Amino acid sequence: MKFAVEDDFLEISELFKNNRKLFPHIRMGYLLRSIQQNECIYTDGVVIIFKIHQRTTQIGNITKSQKSDCHLNQILTTKNDGSASKILNQFFNYISLLPHASGVIYLNVRSENDSAKKFYERNGMKLIDKISWSDGKIEGDVYQIIVKKNGNQNLESFFPSFDASKYV
């Protein structure tokens, strides 16, 4: 697993443009900022965009994420070969190693996106809440996984491309 770099931007933006039906709201400025802030993973055709919350944030009808919880914003894959599950689970392990992350990971998905919901459930996430967007016109579900904190492992050895100096 590796972080996306600015040289990956055009390739990643094309992936999102080719999947406008699933990701109509992705703006290129947001994508570039995510890459620049090391909040975008890009490995084996899999893109994961995430954020570690800096304050309490409402993410469902009832659910609020706390400071240091992770919100997984987008997952996009170009293949159906298991690579998305592999990278997602590596991402979960990465979050478990971050000293400033709680280990609680949330994501929101459209209620109608059955294939994505099955994918999240296969990878250990649980449906915990509902949400809606666009004045209630779009229904969504909130999923959560809590990963066990694994402070005894070294980030640099687990992710060779990880630069710990960026997080000090």
Feature names for model-found ranges:
Residues 1-7, 149-168:
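Conserved N-terminal entry element of GNAT/NAT acetyltransferase domains
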Residues 48-71, 134-138:
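Conserved acyl-donor/pantetheine-binding loop and adjacent beta-alpha core of acyl/acetyltransferases
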Residues 77-96, 118-122:
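Conserved acetyl-CoA-binding loop-helix of GNAT-fold acetyltransferases
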Residues 95-109:
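Conserved GNAT acetyl-CoA-binding A-motif
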